[in-house]
Amino acid sequence: IFMSNLIISKKNEVYLHVNAEPHVYYELADQFTFELPDAKFMPQYKSKYWDGKIRLFNTQTGQIYVGLLDRVVQFCKDHEYTYQFKESEFYGLPFEVNDFISKEGVKDYMFSICKHSPREYQIEGVYDALRHNRKLLISPTASGKSLMIYSIVRYYVEKKQSILIVVPTTSLVEQMYKDFADYGWDVGSYCHKIYAGKERETDSQVIITTWQSIYKLPRKYFERFSVVIGDEAHQFKSKSLVSIMSKLSDAKYRFGFTGTLDGTQTHKWVLEGLFGASYKIIKTDELMKKGHLAKLNINILLLKHSPNKFETFEDEIQYIIGHNRRNNFIKNLALDLKGNTLILYARVEGHGQPPVSYTHLRAHETP
């Protein structure tokens, strides 16, 4: 009987189980191991307690995050290994598509639940998410992310599912609650907010919370949720996000939203593993072309200085910061520009203070 090299099944909604020969385990371990760029600054690394590497495949248990299934399949293709999916009695197949979802159906639904007309790429994003049950959606600033989250929430509310929405700050909890109300929903009947000082126990179908408020809660608290949505997922601390998402072992539907995967606190593969394969909804330049964002013009003004030698880099910085002609040039440029002017400094204390005449500019100094 022909046997596949890898037999892949679901342990739960967090982990896949891979059954394979030991040598395949070690190849998988190599494939799914990466070094953290900032590891050398961490106490565990300095004390030689940890080698600075994150291992996403466990050779002892044969487990890997469900969201990395596409990458495991690609690994098999690259290494010419055969694989098969084995169905779990409780969790089904590792890869499932919701065939009941159609693009036209999503479009009609989004128009019916919202006072604002959804854009084509928003419909595409919601369709892709609902069809695949889990996704990491990359959605730039001003792309209308909250409308997409709202549409996903409304769909699962109608399916009588309990939904957990996790955001990084209390202001985002309030903002999302307000956005849902603005879209015309009776938000008070369905949603409950949790952050410092707010009650955690509730019968509400939808909970909007900061990750800081819930990551230490016991596993039992998370049992009732079948849907989890992480907004601004790149801002979550890796350990806390893993803690929350690992406790949601029965949450079949997982959606992460992030503006970028560059410079994330949590590695891209960890985010994909916890939520699902990434899907880029639209790029910022496309938003500009379509007129959804103001067009951006960048003019680079290069000020040339006469040659000078400095002992240290800091001496050079101080010379530039304190250069009167340069500071006057910036001041006059800002005064000549029409409309609102924003002046950004890397060092507000040193950079923004010297020209006293800056203070009468109607501009904001932002660190």
What is the meaning of each model-derived region?
Residues 172-193:
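Conserved helix-turn-beta segment of the N-terminal RecA-like "Helicase ATP-binding" lobe
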Residues 164-166, 170-172, 333-356:
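Conserved strand-helix element at the start of the C-terminal RecA-like helicase core
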